[in-house]
Amino acid sequence: MDEIIACLEQKVLLLTKIWNLTKQIQVRCTQEEVELDQFLDLRGVYIERVNKCNKLIQKLTRDLPADQQKHLTHILQQEPIDEKLCVSDEERQIVKLTLNCADLLQKAGQLDRSAREILTHQCEELKEKINQLRKAEKNPNLYRDTV
């Protein structure tokens, strides 16, 4: 159980970093010059690490006896759990960390959706400006020969 708790603690740290990066991405999306490459790359690295934590947790869970495996799988489902089902402090800690992970994922997801909406809106505005410029010109070709 200690290894699973360590993985969940690591996952909370990584998800916190993802959430913080997503906040920065959202702020950057509102600026005139949107440069997100380094943020997206770093967030991708953290997401890969979270996936590794998930795989290790699954492996460690599979290595448990069948009854413990079923019980722990239920606890890790990220659903509201009756703490009376937890038979040890370790299980209560696992529930707490699992719920913390779910909360961080939800927050990061909301910010990500917001950033995407901002970028989509900006893209639509730019398309509209380009279309207006094209209509204002007699020649719809944006790239005129100046020779």
Language-model regions: role of each:
Residues 52-76:
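Short, solvent-exposed, charged loop/turn and helix-capping segments
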